A protein has these predicted regions:
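Short, flexible loop segments at boundaries between secondary-structure elements
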Residues: 143-169
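Active-site rim loops that border cofactor/substrate pockets in soluble metabolic enzymes
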Residues: 72-117, 126
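Hydrophobic alpha-helical bundle architecture
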Residues: 114, 128-143
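Conserved small/polar residues in nucleotide/adenosyl-binding loops
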Residues: 201-203
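Short, solvent-exposed amphipathic alpha-helical segments in soluble enzyme
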Residues: 85-89, 134-141, 166-170
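Hydrophobic/aromatic beta-strand patches that form the interior of the parallel beta-sheet core
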Residues: 68-70, 119-121, 149-154
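Ligand-binding beta-strand-loop-alpha-helix segment within the catalytic cores
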Residues: 2-79
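Conserved active-site and cofactor/substrate-binding residues in soluble primary-metabolism enzymes
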Residues: 17-21, 35, 39, 53, ...
Length: 203
């Protein structure tokens, strides 16, 4: 058996390959067109609702409650392997993931919202995507407010290019986040997030 490591998490390679093949199977049955990651994750939710052995996963729970999940770097994951397998099997007619349409959809959500805030665990592509909706809206000629608040829980340090090379204070200089209501929390998320959630439950 092979073991894969993702940061501090160990995964059975055989189980991971089952996931890849399942993604391929889901894609094979879909209408041939472009999908945003949100649309494709809805299809994963539908599949899990019928076929999952273990209930209560994040994706299935989001599907049950009509909560959208966006994954801007969807292809930069094991699930991306499943889509490559799908395209290899169907070279002429296959689905694609449209990250540009997805960014446009996220921007439209920002444009339509009365106010917005960010709660980020980690960083990377999702952090940049959601912050940049403010700038994208302005480039489209829409007058939008900055995100009113932002909290980021991370162990990354911006000095060496990690943390997406910037703290939330720097994000405020781009007009993305209100600088008076931002907080960097330098901590391991699994030790901090449960405390935050518990506090919210008891408010």
């Amino acid at each position: 058996n092979y073991i894969d490591r993702i940061y501090d998490t160990y995964i059975d390679e055989n189980e991971l390959q089952i996931c890849d093949k399942t993604i391929c199977e889901i894609a094979d049955k879909l209408e041939v067109r472009s999908y945003t990651s949100r649309e494709f994750i809805v299809e994963i939710g539908k599949y899990l609702k019928i076929n999952s052995k273990k209930k209560g996963s994040l994706i299935e729970t989001a599907y049950d409650n009509n909560v959208p999940i966006f994954c801007p770097a969807f292809t930069d994951s094991s699930a991306g392997f499943g889509l490559v397998m799908h395209q290899e099997k169907n070279p002429e007619k296959h689905i694609t993931i449209d990250s540009i349409r997805e960014f446009r959809e996220l921007t439209e959500i920002k444009i339509q919202s009365k106010g917005s805030g960010l709660f980020m665990i980690g960083g990377g592509v999702p952090k940049n995507f959601i912050q940049d909706t403010v700038i994208c809206a302005e480039l489209l000629g829409k007058d939008v407010d900055m995100h009113k608040y932002a909290i980021q829980i991370t162990v990354a340090d911006s000095r060496d290019g990690a943390c997406s090379s910037s703290t939330l204070k720097e994000a405020s200089s781009w007009g993305k986040v209100n600088t008076t209501k931002e907080q960097m929390v330098f901590a391991e998320a699994t030790s901090v997030l449960p405390l935050v959630i518990l506090s919210l439950i008891h408010i």
